[in-house]
């Protein structure tokens, strides 16, 4: 039996593509590498053996703190090497983030293959630094290759989980014949977007819309507005059903979410997270805006009035939503997970 180590941690954007790949490798023994007390503890659960190492990113100007982080990284590299040896791992797959550094370098130290998936249009620091040490870098956006001239890249888009490919019933009391707005802040929520949206909700409800607002778990005002047609939820595990049913999404622009919007053909208003590393969400969103699959607004320029009217204008012009939906579907790559699985299989066979 082939053995794969998946290193994916922290956010849905890192975890969901890795889970989608794992679904397409049913005959593999999969070990999962994460970080203590992160989202993988919930999402991976007992589906795969979960191993944790204590690593973090270099995000401080303190020399002492950076030395401590460097020590953790070096220790993590040897912990990964030990994990690879004791579990007879054939290939390492990672979706980036700081867990990727010990995973990639540990694979090199152990003498096995490493595959990195970069979902964002602008590659992260770890990807730029370590892509040359990977046997292949799979890309979520074709245009990303220009930023990784020394890497062996292949464009596969970003995989999504299997429920997105089949109709999923929405288990919320929402009639079929009413417009539905889905507000998505990503796996960690988006308080700034939440605050904007709550000021717009009364007018959207007055226009006859229902609203499912995924607030995240850290919004202290999440339950301040009540209405029978407004559903404020910290997290919703039937994202496929929600996006398939939604007439319009108001969303951040993480690569995983954008891929899900494309697969489901959901028109969107995108508000990139302004503090994302390298402003990568803005670049992700621009691809969708250029394709006329989404409307793009920068958070610094967005007022409640602008957002309110943008949504109302979309609801008043269903032909616009229909056109945006078609353009979103044209961006979808339906076999992304299978392409990644084939890539992994190829490296196992030559190991």
Swiss-Prot record:
<dbReference type="InterPro" id="IPR007235">
    <property type="entry name" value="Glyco_trans_28_C"/>
</dbReference>
<dbReference type="GO" id="GO:0051991">
    <property type="term" value="F:UDP-N-acetyl-D-glucosamine:N-acetylmuramoyl-L-alanyl-D-glutamyl-meso-2,6-diaminopimelyl-D-alanyl-D-alanine-diphosphoundecaprenol 4-beta-N-acetylglucosaminlytransferase activity"/>
</dbReference>
<dbReference type="GO" id="GO:0005975">
    <property type="term" value="P:carbohydrate metabolic process"/>
</dbReference>
<keyword id="KW-0808">Transferase</keyword>
<feature type="binding site">
    <location>
        <position position="187"/>
    </location>
    <ligand>
        <name>UDP-N-acetyl-alpha-D-glucosamine</name>
    </ligand>
</feature>
<feature type="binding site">
    <location>
        <begin position="11"/>
        <end position="13"/>
    </location>
    <ligand>
        <name>UDP-N-acetyl-alpha-D-glucosamine</name>
    </ligand>
</feature>
<dbReference type="InterPro" id="IPR006009">
    <property type="entry name" value="GlcNAc_MurG"/>
</dbReference>
<dbReference type="GO" id="GO:0050511">
    <property type="term" value="F:undecaprenyldiphospho-muramoylpentapeptide beta-N-acetylglucosaminyltransferase activity"/>
</dbReference>
<keyword id="KW-0573">Peptidoglycan synthesis</keyword>
<dbReference type="GO" id="GO:0030259">
    <property type="term" value="P:lipid glycosylation"/>
</dbReference>
<feature type="binding site">
    <location>
        <position position="281"/>
    </location>
    <ligand>
        <name>UDP-N-acetyl-alpha-D-glucosamine</name>
    </ligand>
</feature>
<keyword id="KW-0328">Glycosyltransferase</keyword>
<keyword id="KW-0133">Cell shape</keyword>
<keyword id="KW-0472">Membrane</keyword>
<dbReference type="InterPro" id="IPR004276">
    <property type="entry name" value="GlycoTrans_28_N"/>
</dbReference>
<feature type="binding site">
    <location>
        <position position="161"/>
    </location>
    <ligand>
        <name>UDP-N-acetyl-alpha-D-glucosamine</name>
    </ligand>
</feature>
<keyword id="KW-1003">Cell membrane</keyword>
<comment type="function">
    <text>Cell wall formation. Catalyzes the transfer of a GlcNAc subunit on undecaprenyl-pyrophosphoryl-MurNAc-pentapeptide (lipid intermediate I) to form undecaprenyl-pyrophosphoryl-MurNAc-(pentapeptide)GlcNAc (lipid intermediate II).</text>
</comment>
<feature type="binding site">
    <location>
        <position position="120"/>
    </location>
    <ligand>
        <name>UDP-N-acetyl-alpha-D-glucosamine</name>
    </ligand>
</feature>
<dbReference type="Pfam" id="PF04101">
    <property type="entry name" value="Glyco_tran_28_C"/>
</dbReference>
<keyword id="KW-0961">Cell wall biogenesis/degradation</keyword>
<keyword id="KW-0997">Cell inner membrane</keyword>
<dbReference type="GO" id="GO:0008360">
    <property type="term" value="P:regulation of cell shape"/>
</dbReference>
<dbReference type="GO" id="GO:0009252">
    <property type="term" value="P:peptidoglycan biosynthetic process"/>
</dbReference>
<comment type="pathway">
    <text>Cell wall biogenesis; peptidoglycan biosynthesis.</text>
</comment>
<keyword id="KW-0131">Cell cycle</keyword>
<dbReference type="GO" id="GO:0005886">
    <property type="term" value="C:plasma membrane"/>
</dbReference>
<protein>
    <recommendedName>
        <fullName>UDP-N-acetylglucosamine--N-acetylmuramyl-(pentapeptide) pyrophosphoryl-undecaprenol N-acetylglucosamine transferase</fullName>
        <ecNumber>2.4.1.227</ecNumber>
    </recommendedName>
</protein>
<dbReference type="Pfam" id="PF03033">
    <property type="entry name" value="Glyco_transf_28"/>
</dbReference>
<keyword id="KW-0132">Cell division</keyword>
<dbReference type="GO" id="GO:0051301">
    <property type="term" value="P:cell division"/>
</dbReference>
<dbReference type="GO" id="GO:0071555">
    <property type="term" value="P:cell wall organization"/>
</dbReference>
<comment type="similarity">
    <text>Belongs to the glycosyltransferase 28 family. MurG subfamily.</text>
</comment>
